[in-house]
């Protein structure tokens, strides 16, 4: 900083201010979501800072206010001392260029990165489990490691032959004779989760009344959906549900869509190949999570974001609830685009927005009273408002079910929650209610990394090896649409066949579940990692 700015006080202010801001951001993010601040957060959120400030739900720490004052005082002291670098720019800038080139060369290969980090007592950790990275290396060290390790780590055994060996024996499965080309509605419901699972908590009404009634019907499939998100990170399960790939071995906290730079096979592309109209509906900005750029590359042709929904205006009876486009408007939008495209089968992926955090004081008048004597005031506020939001989502689900039942065209709805909600800083509601303790075991991880899902159709679904009628299903994000494909008899690729066998060996798995697995099961996990690398960063041999 001093080499560029010359003046000591300015370098002090810029350098101290930057790292102070980064440290504060890390504190706020971890307090709200239990996840750390990553380098790619800077790139992804740079254009949304004005919106993001509305998501802050924890008090600004006094310690960080003191740190800001300290940086200011130091800058003033240096200013009056007159300290500066007494070298002209024509010497400073070339020297800086030499330093930059040397740094670039020293991290130009993965081997050099590892060697450089180890010399400074910093060690590469499992990129999917950043807790160990931050605990071992501290914030600055872990942040540096993440900057230098933003590329996906290549599996040691990756090659075209290795990919072929994994998929050897699997063949393309054509559609079944009874495949009716049904419309497919796939809904990611923001933070859809059952708050009645919080021990000792009472509710004046059941927030998931409709979900439970629909799940009890004879032709319905429901259960637990295992996700890689917690309190945020919608994009991870979203990516896995649409592609069948895993985010376990991508840099933790990254935006998976940033790696989809060319056409990539997905569950969506299977239906596009059958002549389906493919579209996405999301009542939020199109630039978030790089969706606008990535969706067409996995086969989604029509993109409808908040600007399209606002443009439809009165035609949808647009309403705002909880500071977002309401779930009622969201369901109206889905119905609108399905009715508009009734001349051909449709695959529609929708992401709701109404029940997005922050929850404190989200709704003017919460619909359901919530009580738990263990909750402090702020936690009770968050849980109460979340409960109103998830009740609205439950009504949205019922509306779509009624819509499907009144259609002549075969239609299937696949509905799931992306992650548990943030209910107070540091998992407050879950800890205060006793749902989780200070130490986690496998059961605890299953609780916090699973949400409800439901599959419903206006035609007989039957059963499959991955999904069956009833409420006791367990499915992973990357296998959900694989199971649906088998239910309706749509074509299945060799990769989808591989994932089904993976589920036979290990019914549900992601690295965040901390499951103890056998050596044989580990082979399937490693195979999934290799195939994911192949499609997002490798030669795409599995698509040939």
Task: Give the label of every model feature segment.
Residues 46, 136-142, 160, 208, ...:
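Alpha-helix initiation and N-capping motif
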Residues 15-18, 110, 137-140, 394-401, ...:
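Short amphipathic alpha-helical surface patches that serve as generic macromolecular interface elements
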Residues 32, 40, 129-139, 228-232:
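Membrane-interface micro-motifs in multi-pass membrane enzymes
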Residues 171-182, 186-189, 194-544:
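Solvent-exposed soluble domains appended to multi-pass membrane proteins
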Residues 56-59, 168-171, 260:
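N-terminal post-signal-peptidase region of extra-cytosolic proteins
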Residues 107-186:
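Membrane-interface segments at or immediately adjacent to transmembrane helices
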Residues 1-130:
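Transmembrane and membrane-interface helices of multi-pass
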Residues 3, 28, 56-63, 75-79, ...:
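Short secondary-structure junctions and interdomain/linker hinges
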